[in-house]
Amino acid sequence: MKKASQLSTTILTIFIVLAIGMMVKGTVGKQRLCIKVLTNASHVSKGASTCDSKLCTSLCEKISPQGVSFCKPIATTGQSKKGNPVCNCRYWCRSDGTPHTT
């Protein structure tokens, strides 16, 4: 009789631990990598657009302190040639797109 009681207690404990784990996973959510284009870090001068890397870094850090910024040309519509460089900010975010803070 004692062994049956110990077995049921063990099974109950396992289910409780699994239930708590599922609740924690649901509240924390999965992280994913987000990329945001920051157009206000680009300047137009003499008909050509340039990306200010210092301004790009500063704006990206405002979005997420762990964010990584880089200036990257984007392809122009309908063409395979590279277009004007724009500021991109890459950071870890939640499923809703908000930055993940640690």
UniProtKB/Swiss-Prot annotation:
Pfam families to which the protein is assigned, alphabetical: SLR1-BP
Subcellular location, principal: secreted
Region forming the signal peptide: 1-29
GO cellular component, as recorded: extracellular region
Compartments where found: Secreted
Entry keyword annotation includes Signal: yes
A GO BP entry: killing of cells of another organism
Keyword Disulfide bond: yes
PANTHER family: DEFENSIN-LIKE PROTEIN 144-RELATED (PTHR34783:SF1)
The protein's name in its UniProt record: Putative defensin-like protein 152
Organism: Arabidopsis thaliana
Classification of source organism: Eukaryota, Viridiplantae, Streptophyta, Embryophyta, Tracheophyta
Gene name of the record: LCR11
